[in-house]
Amino acid sequence: MDLDAITKHSASHAKPDGLILQYGTAGFRTKADRLDHVMFRMGLLAVLRSKQTKSTIGVMVTASHNPEDDNGVKLVDPLGEMLAPSWEEHATHLANAEEQDLARALVAISEEAAVNLHQDAFVVIGRDTRPSSEKLSESVIDGVTVLGGQFHDYGLLTTPQLHYMVCCRNTGGQYGEATIDGYYHKLSTAFVELSKQASCSGDDHRTLKVDCANGIGALKLKEMKHYLPQGLSVQLFNDGTKGKLNHFCGADFVKSHQKPPEGIEMKANERCCSFDGDADRIIYYYCDVDGHFHLIDGDKIATLISSFLKELLLEIGESLTVGVVQTAYANGSSTRYLEEVMKVPVYCTKTGVKHLHHKAQEFDLGVYFEANGHGTVLFSKAAEAKIRQLAKELEDKKGKAAKMLENVIDLFNQATGDAISDMLVIEAILALKGLTIQQWDALYTDLPNRQLKVKVADRQVISTTDAERQVVKPPGLQEAINDLVKKYKLSRAFVRPSGTEDVVRVYAEADSQENADSLAYEVSLAVFQQAGGVGERPQPGF
């Protein structure tokens, strides 16, 4: 390791004085003009991680659903999964090291992680469409090359596409071909094969309007359209030709504001969906004949997919386990429907994709979706082998069901949540089951809910257990919440500290919107009084 060369190169990627950043679930995110040093250093770290794992490592330059002026970076581990927690700590330490301490920090990481510095390293890089992304990705490459790493720059990619590339490169092509053409070919072939089983339906049923958040999803969906059959008509809106990234559009905007994005023309009962800025989240929605907006979030997506998978498994007579993984934010109606109607076991984890992904790996077929629309399905190696074997052996209805399951395996991006992949799965299932978006929405009715934030002096005064559904401290707060919940029908409430700011997040649901609002207000007040609230006291009616 040529520490002098690293120090020299680092001087042209100087760290702003006093800037401290934390590598979180989404990697690093902040204003784009504060990230040059972080990008250079993540190039260095990716090389060390590659040497340590003897694998290709990915670096994605994106800030997902954040405003266009922000940017960020995250590393992708060998099987396309998120960076290991111990290396998140290394990333934070390296990003925050002062200029004169950088060389020492690199040596410390190398020693602590037992990195063989003579091992070859290979890093792949992708970026979104933000104006700052190209220059920042060049800083990553500078970091990779100064440490002697080899690299391939894929240029513009969705985040899930980079995860796919990393997985392909580290599995000897077993997962697929590590090119953009390979990605489109794998997904489109599976979609075409799966859709062949659908009885013909009118064009109206197969038209989908997609809000691309003025992001990378638009470019990649345009490319993919050439691979898709005529039967699926996809109309793109907010495609980046005008309008800013994530500005009044995209999955996060639609979910948080509970209204359609700007820039999309919606007629009654038309099927619409939104991607987020880097195309790893998707949510569906429509307006009814009375003009009312209906949101179909990750909970309902998970319900549609898991019920379809269970039906196919019943058809082939296999006792493979299906599990659905949710967070405490999942609507209570979805949990009840899955457990009581579909008889599918549901498990709750802490908030954050890595927790859901990890839990989903415990099942033969693990379905996970956050309410925000980020999710996928994981198939165990044994389940995948069994399904592929049955697809060859079985005939008639059972054989057809096994082949459909095999196509579903290939259609999901098992490395991470992928808006394009999830969209194709959903469209295939709706066509196969002959469901309209209204019928899908009617599977169950969401309980009214309300989310609020309470400013506190120190968010660390609150600690939780039971997948963030119970407060452990301060003492007495959980008892107060329990007493408030008892006042309302079909109600529940929980509070959890924010991961990024000194606020406590409050979630409440009940049998009516009025009751959900009242419960959320009363719980907020309890938090304010017992957990060191600052500023204005919570008010009824917000």
From Swiss-Prot:
Pfam families xref list: AMG1_II, AMG1_III, PGM_PMM_I, PGM_PMM_IV
Location of the active site: S64 (phosphoserine intermediate)
Enzyme class label: isomerase
Reaction equations catalysed: N-acetyl-alpha-D-glucosamine 1-phosphate = N-acetyl-D-glucosamine 6-phosphate
Record note on cofactor: Binds 1 Mg(2+) ion per subunit.
pH dependence: Optimum pH is 7-7.5.
GO biological process: carbohydrate metabolic process; hemopoiesis; UDP-N-acetylglucosamine biosynthetic process
Regulation acting on activity, per entry: Inhibited by Mn(2+), Cd(2+), Zn(2+), Cu(2+) and Be(2+).
Domain of life, source organism: Eukaryota
Cofactor: Mg(2+)
Residue numbers bearing the N-acetylmethionine modification: M1
This enzyme's EC code(s): 5.4.2.3
Modified residues (Phosphothreonine): T62
Metabolic or biological pathway, per its Swiss-Prot or TrEMBL entry: Nucleotide-sugar biosynthesis; UDP-N-acetyl-alpha-D-glucosamine biosynthesis; N-acetyl-alpha-D-glucosamine 1-phosphate from alpha-D-glucosamine 6-phosphate (route I): step 2/2
InterPro entries: A-D-PHexomutase_a/b/a-I, A-D-PHexomutase_a/b/a-I/II/III, A-D-PHexomutase_C, A-D-PHexomutase_C_sf, A-D-PHexomutase_CS, AMG1_II, AMG1_III, PAGM
Family: Belongs to the phosphohexose mutase family.
Role: Catalyzes the conversion of GlcNAc-6-P into GlcNAc-1-P during the synthesis of uridine diphosphate/UDP-GlcNAc, a sugar nucleotide critical to multiple glycosylation pathways including protein N- and O-glycosylation.
Stated name of the protein: Phosphoacetylglucosamine mutase
Organism: Sus scrofa (Pig)
Gene (name only): PGM3
